[in-house]
Amino acid sequence: MGQCYDVKLKLKFRDGEKDELRTVKAMQKYIKDHDGKGVNFGLDEWKKEGNGLSTLKDMLRVFFAGWNCWDFEMTQGRKWLHVRNGFDASYGWESIMLDIFDVISPFLEDGSELWIYPDSDYDHLIVKEGKCVTVH
């Protein structure tokens, strides 16, 4: 049994492509440090879906989507990258999403945000002065 999530991200990188690459590397390291150690990222399933671990889109799908995602959307606006997705995952996956947003916060522009709407309640995090701040 799992939980349904609706996730929204609004991202901008502090130093453009350099910080986008740093973000990808930080997410790769998180996977290396945690996969199989209480966390199952389902890398074999992602590989079957044609999703690797080398691009920002790949990494955002691994952390903020599921193989059975409903409508993964990633669009670049004039200033912000917007990601939206609904998916099913374990109840513990919420903590993974919160952790990784904290990990990548130093590379994000102030005002970058994460909203997680699980079955009940919600989480809202924002980057202020390069740090992850919990709003709700």
Regions found by a protein language model. Name each.
Residues G52-H136:
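Charged interaction segments
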Residues D33-A65:
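Short, well-structured hydrophobic secondary-structure segments
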Residues M1-F41:
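Short, extreme N-terminal segment that most often corresponds to the first beta-strand
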Residues G2, G16-E20, E49-L53, W93, ...:
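Intrinsic-disorder-associated interaction segments
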